Amino acid sequence: MQNAGIAFDSLEQLNAARQLACRLGLPLLTPPLNLGRPTITLVLSAQRLELHHPELGAPLFVDFVKGAMGYRRRQGEGRKQPLARAIGLKGNVCPDVLDATAGLGRDAFVLAMLGCPVRLIEQSPVIGALLEDGLARARKTPETAPIIAQMTLMQANAVDWMGTLNAQDFPDVVYLDPMYPERTKSALVKKEMRLLRILAGKDENAPLLLEVALECARQRVVVKRPRPGVFLAGVKPDFSIESKTTRFDIYLTH
């Protein structure tokens, strides 16, 4: 990735920052740092890994313990929420889920919280590093450790990875959350989503992703879309489940 680098806020983080830079193939930036420059910077501190970008204000990081995800965990949202219904959670049944577009891992965390084993695939090395850091920190916290134990992260191209699966390793459900179509007014696009677009790029392979997902899901493929959005690749689902802003399109495969 051009115009990006790895930084650290103390010498104690130097070795870890150097290893991360080597793994991601990014330059190691040495202090003093000017975080106002036009670059994407991963900053490693003793607390967490953060992503800084001058146009997007506050840094981006993954947190399953506090913040919005901590609130959802404490609220104990049940199986009647739209995501759970879309996945097919009923009774004591917890389907094996493959989240092929993991992103920051929020939906995968909710599904793991509800008892589903979840395999997460993230193609972007930078997003994957942020997610890996968030999982590692949550793994050390007693309240979230059992949930994180249900989650397995892989950094890979989802189409290629699913193509290598043997039939016995097929998931019950493949979950897809491709980038929503970009709105014409940039002010309406959340800064976080704008940054993810920069990192992940356009979902030009989304139609192929759906095609491969339909071939390997034992029970269903679930596609998350904006409520008024078009069907992914123009393929009509068997049915949909809606919330105020989101629509889950369900494609049955059995």
Swiss-Prot record:
GO terms for molecular function: rRNA (guanine-N2-)-methyltransferase activity. The keyword Cell membrane does not apply. Its EC number is 2.1.1.242. It holds the Pfam family SAM_MT. It catalyses: guanosine(1516) in 16S rRNA + S-adenosyl-L-methionine = N(2)-methylguanosine(1516) in 16S rRNA + S-adenosyl-L-homocysteine + H(+). S-adenosyl-L-methionine binds at R106, D107, D177. Keywords: Cytoplasm, Methyltransferase, rRNA processing, S-adenosyl-L-methionine, Transferase. One of its GO terms (cellular component) is cytoplasm. It is found in: Cytoplasm. It is an enzyme of class 2 (transferase). InterPro entries: 16SrRNA_methylTrfase_J, SAM-dependent_MTases_sf. The keyword S-adenosyl-L-methionine applies. Its main location: cytoplasm. Belongs to the methyltransferase superfamily. RsmJ family. Specifically methylates the guanosine in position 1516 of 16S rRNA. This is Ribosomal RNA small subunit methyltransferase J.
